[in-house]
């Protein structure tokens, strides 16, 4: 199991996945990332305008690497800190007071 899969499974089971997604969504909106990606999509669609068979899947494939690179480091760092905090809180909850 990869770290990504472990984090995904843990956050889903703990109920924190929604909190993390909400935090990410709000931060990406605040920093203008969503607007940048929207403009990027428009640009690609205009570029490919003559190709009527250009699919949504192809657009996603082309946009995804660029969109990921546009996520500000501060947002990535804040998300990582939030995930670590959730894990730390879970570890603290798992400690048996009689064993400590």
Swiss-Prot record:
Pfam family, one: EnY2
UniProt feature coiled coil, ranges: none
The keyword Protein transport is annotated on this UniProt entry: yes
MF (Gene Ontology): chromatin insulator sequence binding; transcription coactivator activity
Gene Ontology cellular component terms for the protein in this record: cytoplasm; DUBm complex; nuclear pore; nucleoplasm; SAGA complex; transcription export complex 2
Biological processes annotated in GO: chromatin organization; mRNA export from nucleus; positive regulation of transcription by RNA polymerase II; protein transport; transcription elongation by RNA polymerase II
Localization per Swiss-Prot or TrEMBL: Nucleus, Nucleoplasm; Cytoplasm
Record keyword rRNA-binding present: no
Keywords: Activator, Chromatin regulator, Cytoplasm, mRNA transport, Nucleus, Protein transport, Transcription, Transcription regulation, Translocation, Transport
InterPro entries: TF_ENY2 (IPR018783), TF_EnY2_sf (IPR038212)
Homology family: Belongs to the ENY2 family.
Subunit (UniProt): Component of the nuclear pore complex (NPC)-associated AMEX complex (anchoring and mRNA export complex), composed of at least e(y)2 and xmas-2. Component of the SAGA transcription coactivator-HAT complexes, at least composed of Ada2b, e(y)2, Pcaf/Gcn5, Taf10 and Nipped-A/Trrap. Within the SAGA complex, e(y)2, Sgf11, and not/nonstop form an additional subcomplex of SAGA called the DUB module (deubiquitination module). Component of the THO complex, composed of at least e(y)2, HPR1, THO2, THOC5, THOC6 and THOC7. Interacts with e(y)1. Interacts with su(Hw) (via zinc fingers).
Function, in words: Involved in mRNA export coupled transcription activation by association with both the AMEX and the SAGA complexes. The SAGA complex is a multiprotein complex that activates transcription by remodeling chromatin and mediating histone acetylation and deubiquitination. Within the SAGA complex, participates in a subcomplex that specifically deubiquitinates histone H2B. The SAGA complex is recruited to specific gene promoters by activators, where it is required for transcription. Required for nuclear receptor-mediated transactivation.
Entry-linked PANTHER family: ENHANCER OF YELLOW 2 TRANSCRIPTION FACTOR
Protein name as it appears in the record: Enhancer of yellow 2 transcription factor
Organism in which the protein naturally occurs: Drosophila pseudoobscura pseudoobscura
Lineage: Eukaryota, Metazoa, Ecdysozoa, Arthropoda, Hexapoda
